[in-house]
Swiss-Prot record:
GO terms for molecular function: 3-hydroxybutyrate dehydrogenase activity; 4-oxoproline reductase activity; oxidoreductase activity, acting on the CH-CH group of donors, NAD or NADP as acceptor. Its EC number is 1.1.1.-, 1.1.1.30, 1.1.1.104. Gene3D superfamilies: NAD(P)-binding Rossmann-like Domain. The gene is bdh2. This is Dehydrogenase/reductase SDR family member 6. Substrate binds at R144, R188, R205. It comes from Danio rerio (Zebrafish). Homotetramer. The keyword NAD applies. Pathway: Amino-acid metabolism; Siderophore biosynthesis.
Length: 245
């Protein structure tokens, strides 16, 4: 018996990093997983894994999100992960940077929740997990202005949905990681003028002396997706190795 036997789970940004690790972990625990991403080539790496179906979806496009939702009679767990990290202070953030980041990090979750929530309400049962960050309303982080703002908005969205639909059988929580060793992080490091120094800077703020792994976050995701966490809602679940302390 798996911890997620029979649960229907839809997640975004599943082609790599936390999304990919979570999709695999969900399937291993018996869930029926639909893994979506905008990157069709990377998403193919999940093809053939028992319990996982893949679908290319741009979660910033309402028509694509609505079409995805129509494919399901019901969904037990919706996991919103899609996000973008902008580097810089408010002075480095152009209006286009602001709009792009808020569109990917916040509006996509709004679209996904709005599309799938009615199906959950019809069954008086549903579980929504949103990816936020310690870099948010939890902790001020240098050169993460619009990113932190967007993730603070995700925390607010999470609490609002949890409060509005608590009595109707809906749970909504968000995960707030610190620095996670993912392909996205490695790409951002390599894009910096001095990648070696950038990596040292990331490591210097890790009080545990190492980065979090995507698999460690996925273990937490399994717990939040399972019935083991039925009394948990409206919560920012932090997994940061003590970075915020």
């Amino acid at each position: 018996m798996g911890r997620l036997d029979g649960k229907v789970i839809v997640l975004s940004a599943a082609a790599q990093g936390i999304g990919k690790a979570s999709a695999i972990a969900f399937a291993k625990e018996g869930a029926q997983v639909t893994a979506t991403d905008i990157n069709g080539e990377k998403l193919k790496e999940l093809d053939g894994i028992p319990g996982i179906k893949t679908k290319v979806v741009d979660v910033t496009k309402k028509d694509q999100v609505d079409a995805l939702a129509k494919d399901f009679d019901h969904v037990d767990v919706l996991f919103n992960i899609a996000g973008f990290v902008h580097h810089g202070s408010i002075l480095d953030c152009e209006e286009s940077d602001w709009d792009f980041t808020m569109n990917v990090n916040v509006r996509s979750m709004y679209l996904m929740i709005k599309a799938f929530l009615p199906k959950m309400l019809a069954r008086k049962s549903g579980n929504i997990i949103n990816m936020a960050s310690v870099a948010s309303s939890i902790k001020g982080v240098v050169n993460r202005c619009v990113y932190s703002t967007s993730k603070a908005a995700v925390i607010g969205l999470t609490k609002s949905v949890a409060a509005d639909f608590l009595e109707q059988g809906i749970r909504c929580n968000c995960i707030c990681p610190g620095t996670v060793d993912t392909p996205s992080l490695r790409e951002r490091i390599q894009a910096r003028p001095d990648p070696e120094q950038a990596f040292k800077d990331f490591m210097a703020r890790q009080r545990t002396g190492r980065l979090c792994t995507a698999e460690e976050v996925a273990h937490l995701c399994v717990y939040l997706a399972s019935d083991e966490s039925t009394f948990v809602t409206g919560t920012e679940v932090i997994i940061d190795g003590g970075w915020r302390l």
